[in-house]
């Protein structure tokens, strides 16, 4: 009986050691001062500039999370953001449908390759991403002339009837937290004091009015924030696209 107990303890110890080794063996560790080069599975890899469509991304191989702030000009890592920096949120390594590997970066997926292929394939470029100031220094504002539009970074975005699914939603950006009643044709906001009034001809003014409860704003996976984003309207997320595109 004693031998049996000793054998069980020994087996548990071996299993525990192998489990710990497997976990550490698969960790992702970025090279010091680099946002593209890293170690995975005891091998050197780099993040390429080749984007993988979301529909081609399958299961995750290893889960991790890392936030890096990179200066756009010097490409040096920073401890805090500035007006010329890019914030990269790197998380998880995935297997693609063709069995290649990719990494999640800012709601997109970029192919990773062994470091030996670096001369033949371009590494990830910071130009693929918005500078930090584009997101943090400007607020989303409902247009004062048309409640169906959003003013962001000096550009106008039109809110469409197209629904954005939960799977398409990217990172949280802002919240509007406002209710507006506006003319259904012109989009002009109607003052709260006039919401319940009756028109001179006796018809109910609400018949040509629309009420929107504005909520959160999210980026959309695979799209630049300056191109389009999702706005929560009456508990559904609607697509807002840049006017003039």
From Swiss-Prot:
Residues 1-19 form the signal peptide. The keyword Amino-acid biosynthesis does not apply. It comes from Lactococcus lactis subsp. lactis. Involved in immunity against exogenously supplied nisin. Pfam families: Spa1_C (PF18218). It is found in: Cell membrane. Gene3D superfamilies: 2.170.150.60. A lipid is attached at residue 20 (S-diacylglycerol cysteine). A lipid is attached at residue 20 (N-palmitoyl cysteine). The lineage of its organism: Bacteria, Bacillati, Bacillota, Bacilli, Lactobacillales. GO terms for cellular component: plasma membrane. It comes from the Bacteria. It is a lipid-anchor. The keyword Cell division does not apply. This is Nisin immunity protein. One of its GO terms (biological process) is bacteriocin immunity. Keywords: Bacteriocin immunity, Cell membrane, Lipoprotein, Membrane, Palmitate, Signal. InterPro entries: Spa1_C. Coiled coil: none annotated.
């Amino acid at each position: 009986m004693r031998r049996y107990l000793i054998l069980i303890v020994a087996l548990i110890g071996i299993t525990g050691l192998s489990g710990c080794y497997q976990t550490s063996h698969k960790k992702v560790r970025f090279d010091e001062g680099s946002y593209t080069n890293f170690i995975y599975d005891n091998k050197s890899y780099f993040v390429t500039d080749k984007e993988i469509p979301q529909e081609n991304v399958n299961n995750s191989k290893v889960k991790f999370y890392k936030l890096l702030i990179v200066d756009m000009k010097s490409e040096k890592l920073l401890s805090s953001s500035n007006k010329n920096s890019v914030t990269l949120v790197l998380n998880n390594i995935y297997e693609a449908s063709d069995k290649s590997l990719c990494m999640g970066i800012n709601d997109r997926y970029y192919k990773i390759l062994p470091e030996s292929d670096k001369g033949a394939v371009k590494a990830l470029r910071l130009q693929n991403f918005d500078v930090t100031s584009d997101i943090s220094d400007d607020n989303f504002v409902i247009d004062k002339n048309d409640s169906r539009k959003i003013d962001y970074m000096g550009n106008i975005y039109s809110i469409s009837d197209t629904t954005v699914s939960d799977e398409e939603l990217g990172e949280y950006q802002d919240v509007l937290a406002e209710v507006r009643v506006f003319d259904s044709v012109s989009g002009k906001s109607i003052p709260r004091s006039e919401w319940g009034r009756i028109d001179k001809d006796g018809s109910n003014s609400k018949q040509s009015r629309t009420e929107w409860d504005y909520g959160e704003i999210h980026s959309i996976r695979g799209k630049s924030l300056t191109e389009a984003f999702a706005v929560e309207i009456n508990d559904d997320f609607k697509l807002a696209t840049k006017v003039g595109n």
